[in-house]
Regions:
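Peripheral docking tails and interdomain loops at the edges
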Residues: 299-302, 307-311, 419-421, 440-441, ...
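A glycine-rich helix N-cap at a beta->alpha junction
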Residues: 87-100, 163-177, 198, 358, ...
Length: 635
């Protein structure tokens, strides 16, 4: 039997369906999500929860003329299925396939790209204001999850919406089911009243009557009584205080009610907020039972939901276990996360030291300033935030931590590629945006044991210090029971010969690649030293000077953009020393890197043994030719 889903090539195909057909389509979409993501991985739970909601939005509105702005946009898979990308959906999050987030370059239906939380309302407001200025009539709908409302940017937007536009629809997708069923039932009943256009007319008429009857005092009393009732029955009076008309909460899985509600909201001449209750993971029992796991995950069994074990500890797990160890050693150690306890591994720390664990929500700036405050009172805060999300905290890092030289530790998970999540999540910029800040130390471990040592070093350091480490598993180096401190700014000489022609300075996960390059050179009769840089700042100037004066070429290798990175730091020091030693830099180019498997992406962008050797041979050949020419000139 043919699926309805197979006939959906654009939102126009959704609009011709009746309610029973839409409900059937919702079931088929869930089956498609479960099947495809079992192979590719992705954000299964959030997308299972927004199927009916997305169907209703496309049934009522007209993209791409109307604009849907998804906060984070990890819950946009259903939107992609309905907007001409159904045939490509099986390749989502695979090389050359659909991105797991919204991309303006991917489809005209994707009006705004995203990957970080809290951006939807500000972007949607910008679109609405631009529309108003040119006299457009398109609708702008911002869809944000309840987690986005822990993000300060969302409230900055809310504070401006009512003052800057009269037509904007905000959908609050509440998938935590935190509202009691009885309260929800009363609110739904009230919502059937307030979504009737006659309600606003009667409401305003009653207001005018009360004003004539008893003046403004009576009107103010009536409004206070209304607000008091709302505070009991409606949990979101704050939105109306900010100038948005609040509707809800309503079920996010009742497609008929959603359609009716959106049709009504289209007629409103003021900013509105619709509060929708959805169930994350709906339609897949394993996702309902383990919502954290199925928020975002790799491939899994589509029947049981079981995922394949990695076989060894990830860097995040090593970080978490080391944090527990450090907290046992030092009562001043505290841990902070910005709504990512599972992703950073701090969910292992929390049960062991609950009074020293702080989840501040999606509030990276607050996390850093909060840590600064803790540090002023003698505590040792470790702030665990993905490299890509720490970008949001640059001003507090400079102004509140480094300027005051406070001993805050920044633990930057995903400090490298983030694989299938793509450019919004790759952590390839932190060395560049942190290296120029006075007082800050920046470390990069080559393996799991060195990560533990660096965290121990950070605990003892009396000043701001950062450590970046990659996603996933490391080389499998055992972690010793007692970590040791590493002297600040001291690189590690891993191998060298009596007459090295090449010195390879490598950072972090590229140290093994450097050793492979050295082995290949050895096979060609070229001796090469390999140095584990360990510090992006301060770099080991003495080591750089020694090899800058003694070798024919230096190679730098980093899992980071070349602009302003570790290689740039080495070049700067050589320049300061007046040395002109040729430098071959290996790292990521000055562009945003697409999603894909890390090994494949590195090969594509030349972060490989072969490409490094090719570039190095050219430099060595040129150097040899210069020596011959110099000798001939002297003769």
């Amino acid at each position: 039997m043919a699926r309805l889903l197979d006939s959906i090539n654009s939102p126009l195909d959704v609009k011709i369906l009746n309610i029973p057909q839409l409900e059937t389509l919702a079931d088929e979409i869930r089956e498609e999500l479960i099947s495809v993501l079992s192979k590719n991985g992705g954000h299964l739970g959030p997308n299972l929860g927004v199927v009916e909601l997305t169907l209703a939005m496309h049934y009522v509105f007209d993209t791409p003329k109307d604009h849907f702005v998804f906060d984070v946009s990890h819950q946009a898979y259903v939107h992609k299925l309905l907007t001409g990308r159904r045939e490509q959906f099986s390749m989502i999050r695979t090389p050359g396939g659909l991105n797991g987030f919204m991309l303006r370059s991917e489809s005209p239906h994707d009006c705004y790209g995203a990957g970080h939380a809290g951006t939807a309302l500000s972007a949607a407001l910008g679109m609405a204001v631009a529309r108003d200025r040119v006299g457009g009539n398109e609708h702008v709908v911002a869809l944000a999850g309840d987690a986005a409302f822990t993000c300060g940017i969302t409230y900055e937007a809310l504070n401006n919406i009512a003052h800057q536009t009269r037509r904007l629809i905000v959908v609050l997708n509440d998938n935590e089911w935190s509202i009691d069923k009885n309260v929800g039932a009363i609110a739904n009943y009230l919502n059937t009243i307030v979504t009737n256009p006659r309600f606003d007319y009667l409401h305003e008429s009653a207001g005018r009557f009360v004003e004539r009857l008893g003046g403004k005092t009576a009107l103010q009393m009536a409004r206070k009584a209304e607000e008091a009732a709302k505070s009991i029955l409606w949990p979101s009076v704050i939105f109306e205080e900010l100038g948005l008309k609040y509707y809800g909460p309503i079920s996010g899985h009742d497609v008929a009610t959603l359609i009716k509600t959106f049709e009504f909201l289209k007629t409103q001449k003021r900013p509105v907020l619709l509060h929708v209750l959805t169930q994350k993971g709906k339609g897949f029992e394993p996702a309902l039972q383990k919502q954290k796991k199925f928020h975002g995950l790799g491939p899994y069994d589509p029947e049981t939901g079981e995922t394949k074990a990695l076989g060894q500890r990830t860097y995040s797990e090593v970080f978490a276990d080391t944090m527990v160890k450090l907290a046992n050693m030092n009562s001043k150690v505290v841990a902070i996360t910005a709504a990512m306890p599972n992703g950073t591994g701090l969910d292992r720390f929390q049960p062991r030291h609950p009074d020293r664990y702080f989840d501040v929500g999606i509030a990276e700036e607050h996390a850093v300033i909060f840590a600064a405050g803790l540090a002023t009172k003698g505590l040792k805060p470790f702030v665990a935030i993905y490299s890509t999300f720490l970008q949001r905290s640059l001003d507090p890092i400079i102004h509140d931590v480094c300027l005051q030289n406070l001993p805050v530790v920044f633990c930057m998970d995903r400090g490298s590629l983030s694989g299938d999540d793509g450019p919004t999540h790759h952590g390839l910029f932190d060395i560049s945006y942190l290296r120029g800040i006075p007082n800050l130390v920046h470390m990069v471990p080559k393996d799991e044991d060195e990560l533990a040592d660096m965290l121990f070093t950070a605990m003892q350091h009396d000043g701001p210090i950062a450590v970046r480490y990659p996603r996933g598993v490391g080389p499998g180096t055992p972690v010793k029971d007692v970590p040791r401190a590493i002297p600040i700014g001291q690189a590690e000489l891993l191998q060298h010969g009596e007459h090295d022609r090449v010195a390879i300075f490598a950072l972090g996960s590229l140290v093994p690649l450097a050793q492979e390059v050295a082995a290949k050179l050895e096979g060609e009769g070229i001796s090469a030293a390999v140095i584990n840089g360990r510090f992006a700042k301060p770099i080991d100037v003495r080591m750089v000077e020694f090899y800058g004066r003694s070798v024919d070429a230096i190679v730098t290798m980093e899992d980071h953009v070349l602009e302003g990175g570790f290689g740039s730091a080495v070049l700067e020091r050589l320049s300061d020393l007046g040395l002109q030693t040729p430098v071959v830099r290996v790292g990521w180019p000055d562009q945003f890197i697409e999603h894909g498997k890390p090994d494949a992406l590195r090969a594509r962008y030349g972060i490989s043994v072969e490409n490094t050797l090719e570039k190095l041979r050219r430099v060595l050949d040129q150097r040899a030719a210069e020596k011959i020419a110099h000798a001939a000139a002297k003769a």
